[in-house]
Each structure stands twice: as C-alpha cells, then as structure tokens.
Design a protein with these regions (language model features):
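H-loop/switch region of ABC-family ATPase nucleotide-binding domains
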Residues: 262-264
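ABC ATPase nucleotide-binding domain "signature" region
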Residues: 97, 214-221
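Walker B catalytic motif
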Residues: 204, 233-234, 241
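ABC-family P-loop ATPase nucleotide-binding domains
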Residues: 72-86, 123-210, 224
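Conserved beta-strand-loop-alpha-helix hinge in the C-terminal portion
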Residues: 278-315
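Iron-sulfur cluster-binding cysteine motifs and their immediate structural context
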Residues: 12-34, 39, 50-67
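Helical segment within the ABC ATPase nucleotide-binding domain
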Residues: 243-255
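Hydrophobic anchor residue at the start of the ABC signature
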Residues: 109, 218, 246
Length: 336
C-alpha cells in the first residue's frame, strides 16, 4: 500500500467493493482505525489484482515474492509497506558499492549499516527493535561482528547525504567556517586542491552551485573522525574531471576505514569500488540485495539485466552502448 496515495474519503472504496473474497464474507481489505487508510490482509488476499485496477489513486501493488526470501527479511516499515531483504557486508580497507534503481532500499540499507535504523526483521509493530535478536539472527555470518560493533557504539559513522541541495537550508555562513569547525585533525589542507575547494572557500553556502555543494558535503563528511564512511551518490552535479578526483580521494580514505558508496555512474563505480552489491526489486514495495560480485562482473550483470547464478531477470531489456550513433536510412531528395 502506498499510504500517501490512499484517500478513502475521496473514493467509493472500490478496493473493498470489488474484492471477490470480501464479497463472499472473508475480510481482506479494511480501513485502519489508526491510519485511516486501506489495509490488506496478506493471508486472505488471493492476489487477483482487481483492487489494483479499480483503485482510482493507484495506491495498491500486489507482488508475489519467492518463498525462500521470507527468511531473509531484514526490515519492514509497516503493514503492506516497503520491505528490505538481505544486507551487504562492509569490509575494512576496501570500497563496497551499491548499485540499483531508486526506491528499492539503498537509503534504508545505509541507515541500517550506519546504526541510524535498527533492523526489525519484519517485526514492524515493535516500537524499538531488539539488537540482541538481530545479532542472534546474524550469528555465524560476516555481518555479525560489524553489526555488534555498530549496536555497541564501537564504530563511529559519517554519512554524505544524497540531496546536497538541502545543505544551504540547514547551515548558513561561509564554506571556510563550516569546514573549519569540522576539521579537528588538520585534514582540510590535504582536501583543498583535490576537491577544488579554494575557488569558493570564502563564499556563503547559499551562493554555491550544485557541484560546489556536492564537494563541500564530501569534504565535510571526510573531515569527521569516523570508522565507517557512507557516500550517497557522490558524483552527482560533478563534471568528469571532478568525479575522478572525488573517486581518488574516497579511495585514499578506504585504506584504513570502512567505505560504502551508493553510485549510479558506472564509470566512477568501476574506478572506485572493488566489490559491488546489485539491488533489485519493485520501487516502493520491496528491495533485494544480491550476492557480492567483483565490480566489473557486477556492472556487466547490471547492463545485461539478468543474474545467472540466482536465475533472476530484473530488467526486460539489455542496456547497450554503441560506439557510434546507429545509422539510419538516408534518402536523397529528388531534384528533378
């Protein structure tokens, strides 16, 4: 259910009226007392799809999941809400990449790995997830030790957010003053030239372009004294030269730290990461994290749209890059 789209007061409750089991007396869809929105019983729903077609606000999706995935549920936001399956494993000394379309849980994944969100393992009714249960669930896996350190606060994290254009709404003042407050270890000097900061250090945050805000956000993240660094789309707004410079700086940071990068630019990801986790699913409904692959293999699989090992096709077409524009039929104009 897309709760933000569901508007029971503006429709005739078509989802309830046309539901076959509902019409025979089985409760499948009802309006929640707390939410005031339609809720669907996943146990009694027969997945006929009639409610999907009848809803005037396009608020319903019915998606069947493979049976084996039910054991891999890491986080669920609520009844009939988004679900995330599996997690990547950060590795100290290397850059881990996340690659996939928008709306399938990359931000949720970063939130869990950074400790901002405790995974509820599908128990969404609990107000506060139990870390002991989470650690027991991941016992014997590579991820257990990492999550244990996160839960105990033994790992400090720093996140470069995706939407850098909001930076000027939360901070006012000169770039130099902002970065100076964060520079506790005297590392700003080493970042000045690689990130091209000198040209706008003395300008106000509110006067910066998207590319300049991006570089300020990257510098601010790297100046924080952390053990784990997350960079959400660090190449956005940057030209090709700036992207490569940023990639080099992030690579240097990863020598002694955990680094996780969410990136859509395949060239930057190829240059930057060693291991990539592909993510696929349905936007706003669920996201699945595939097994790790070497970066070149992951990119080729992503372009092909088919994961041979998992026997999963996550895109109905292959992405191809032509070395030159395709030749079209050219017809000469008849002059006589």
């Amino acid at each position: 259910m897309f709760k933000d789209r569901c508007q029971p007061k503006r429709c005739h409750l078509e989802c309830i009226a046309f539901c076959p089991p509902q019409r025979t007396g089985t409760e499948v869809i009802w309006i929640g007392q707390e939410t005031g929105k339609a809720e669907i019983s996943e146990e009694t729903c027969i997945a006929c799809g009639i409610c999907v077609r009848k809803c005037p606000f396009d608020a319903i999706r019915i998606i069947g999941l493979p049976e084996e995935l039910k054991e891999d549920l890491v986080h669920q936001y609520g009844k009939n809400a988004f679900r995330l399956f599996r997690l990547p494993v950060p590795k100290k000394g290397s850059v881990i990449g996340l690659l996939g379309p928008n709306g399938i849980g990359k931000t949720t994944t970063v939130g869990i790995l950074s400790g901002e969100t405790a995974p509820n393992l599908g128990h969404y009714r609990r107000k506060k997830p139990h870390w002991d249960e989470v650690l027991d669930y991941f016992k014997g896996t590579e991820l257990h030790d990492y999550l244990e350190k996160i839960s105990l606060g033994d790992l400090k994290t720093a996140i470069k957010p995706q939407y850098v254009d909001r930076l000027n709404k939360v901070y006012r003042g000169r770039v130099r003053d902002l970065l100076g407050k964060l520079d506790k270890g005297g590392r700003l000097e080493a970042l000045r030239e690689p990130l091209g900061l000198p040209s706008f250090l003395d300008r106000d945050i509110g006067q910066l372009s998207g590319g300049e805000l991006q570089r300020v956000a990257i510098a601010a993240t790297m100046l924080k004294d952390a053990d784990v660094y997350f960079f959400d789309e660090p190449s956005s707004y940057l030209d090709i030269y700036q992207r490569l410079q940023v990639a080099k700086v992030i690579q240097g940071l990863a020598k002694e730290k955990y680094v996780v990068v969410v990136e859509h630019d395949l060239a930057v990801l190829d240059f930057l990461a060693e291991t990539v986790y592909l993510m696929y699913g349905s936007e706003g409904a669920y996201g699945i994290i595939a097994e790790p692959r070497p970066v070149r293999t992951a990119i080729n699989v992503y372009l092909g749209g088919y994961m041979k090992e998992e026997n999963i096709r996550f895109r109905d077409r292959e992405i191809r890059f032509e070395s030159r524009p395709p030749r079209g039929d050219w017809k000469a104009e008849t002059l006589v």
